[in-house]
From Swiss-Prot:
Pathway, per record: Amino-acid biosynthesis; L-histidine biosynthesis; L-histidine from 5-phospho-alpha-D-ribose 1-diphosphate: step 1/9
Job of this protein: Catalyzes the condensation of ATP and 5-phosphoribose 1-diphosphate to form N'-(5'-phosphoribosyl)-ATP (PR-ATP). Has a crucial role in the pathway because the rate of histidine biosynthesis seems to be controlled primarily by regulation of HisG enzymatic activity.
Keywords: Amino-acid biosynthesis, ATP-binding, Cytoplasm, Glycosyltransferase, Histidine biosynthesis, Magnesium, Metal-binding, Nucleotide-binding, Transferase
Pfam families documented for this protein: HisG, HisG_C
NCBIfam families: hisG, HisG_C-term
Chief location bin: cytoplasm
Catalytic activities: 1-(5-phospho-beta-D-ribosyl)-ATP + diphosphate = 5-phospho-alpha-D-ribose 1-diphosphate + ATP
One GO MF term: ATP binding
Record-given protein name: ATP phosphoribosyltransferase
PANTHER family for this protein: ATP PHOSPHORIBOSYLTRANSFERASE, ATP PHOSPHORIBOSYLTRANSFERASE ATP-PRTASE
Cellular location(s): Cytoplasm
Listed EC numbers: 2.4.2.17
GO biological processes: L-histidine biosynthetic process
């Protein structure tokens, strides 16, 4: 039976309690071999096989928990992290943390948008206009960098309705596909910030056992991300075309070359390629003389 008593020597990790980022974090931990007892009704979860404790909180609470040293690690969108950091610095508060790694999920962009019928050439068209946003500090920094004065209107939700409701002339909000903007009669005109999820650590040094566990997790995360970006490729190649075929497949290391039974003119080539393999690449391999081309996904990888 798993011991779920809170222990001071557990590595404490703060994650978003619900939403797409929460799901992606759960998948990442599973891929890293961390077995978590998830319970949607509980805000604290525990690992079965490692001394890890998960705190499930609001996403905008995670930076503060890291800044204040309440938790050891956190996974958060860079947009939320940057907004909270700018807010604290604006209040003359000290902000310290370590950004360990950008992750390969949580992609989004913070963009300016206006009514689809508005004439827009550049950000200076928004001079002295009211802009609704949930990210006032990121917006202010961008506008200051471009030397544009504006009026900020803070909204914590439903930012897209601000122009049609007469609340603001423009908005600054997160965009993924742009479908929500289009549904509300808006058009995206400028991207002010691009974001992914990232892994952060509190600034204060961890005790050696916790730091060793962090290092282990980092190694596993790196392996998971490299595996997602790589493919294991097997093919047959004429010996005289090896150099040309190898050049089409940039790999982690040199390819493995194996002899083929009863065939002295060709060899089998195995390689882990870091580039995404598209149909065009496979067609180029075939044109170069390769045959029996097999492309396989990689679940885990460690150099």
């Amino acid at each position: 039976m798993t011991n779920t008593t809170m222990q001071p020597n557990r590595l404490r990790i703060a994650l978003q309690k619900k939403g797409r980022l929460s799901q992606d974090c759960a998948i990442l931990l599973k891929q890293c071999g961390v077995k978590i007892n998830w319970n949607e009704q509980r805000l604290i979860a525990y690992a079965e096989n490692l001394p890890i404790e998960i705190l499930r909180v609001r996403d905008d609470d995670i930076p503060g928990l890291i800044f204040d040293g309440v938790v050891d690690l956190g996974i958060i969108g860079e947009n939320v992290l940057e907004e909270e950091e700018l807010g604290r610095r604006a209040a003359n508060e000290t902000v310290t943390y370590k950004k360990l790694r950008q992750l390969d999920f949580g992609d989004c962009r913070l963009s300016l948008a206006v009514d689809r019928d508005c004439h827009y050439e550049n950000v200076k068209d928004l001079a002295n206009r009211r802009i609704a946003t949930s990210y006032p500090h990121l917006l202010k920094r961008y506008m200051n960098e471009n030397g544009v004065s504006f009026k900020s209107c803070l909204l914590n939700g439903s930012v897209e309705v601000a122009p049609s409701a007469g609340i603001a002339y423009a908005i600054c909000d997160l965009v993924s596909s742009g479908a929500t903007l289009e549904a509300n009669g808006l058009k995206e005109v400028d991207v002010i910030y691009r974001s992914k999820a990232c892994l952060i650590q509190r600034a204060e040094p961890l005790e050696s056992t916790k730091q060793a566990l962090v290092d282990k997790l980092l190694t596993r995360i790196q392996g998971v991300q490299q595996a997602a970006e790589s493919k294991y490729i097997m093919l047959h190649a004429p010996k005289e075309k090896l150099e040309k075929i190898t050049a089409l497949l940039p790999g982690v290391e040199n390819p493995t070359i194996l002899p083929l039974a009863s065939d002295t003119t060709r060899v089998a080539m195995h390689v882990v390629s870091q580039e995404n393999l598209f149909w065009e690449t496979m067609e180029q391999l075939k044109e170069a003389g390769a045959s029996s081309i097999l492309v396989l996904p990689i679940e885990k990888m460690m150099e």
